[in-house]
Amino acid sequence: INSGKEVGAQIVLPEMTDVRVREAARELISMDFDILNIEDFQDNLDIYLDFLNKLPFTDNWPADNLREFLNDPLHFAMAMVACDDADCLVAGAVNSSSEVIRSVIRMIGIRPTSNQVSSIFFMISPDGNSAFTFADCAVIPEPDSKQLAAIGAESAEFHHFLTGDEPLVAFLSFSTKGSASHYRVDRLRDAVEL
């Protein structure tokens, strides 16, 4: 949290119709975060339309379709991030995980060194002294060993980026110290060796 405040991170919350998001916005503002209002960026619509028009998935879209697409607050907020008008966005209270992920892949893209998209839950202890990263809880239901290794490495990297702490990585399964023989346990064992 302090890292975000120190760099002056600008956050856009595209789902302000949800009471929980409005409460979160108030809390973030009370913590001195800069919460951007989508309405304040309507003058940039032409910039966002031009950006959107250059993306592969909008090939041959008429101007009306581009405008309609950006009428969705999630897509508009993604354009804000992609065009460097916001540092990050938080979504998923109103839109499904798949809608958010699809929009990220289409409009922002994934890191060139990554072969997949995965998710994390970043949890801060009630006293604020500890942070935990849990992955992948929502995107890849049956990752293979290579995917598990990549998820672990990228999650550890993200944890370090957010906290500055050296992460300790654990792969969890239903087997206690190798008590079970199962292909799901074998995948975890193989991932650790990678």
Predicted regions and their residues:
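Anion-binding alpha/beta catalytic cores of soluble intermediary-metabolism enzymes, centered on
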Residues: 1-34, 40-194
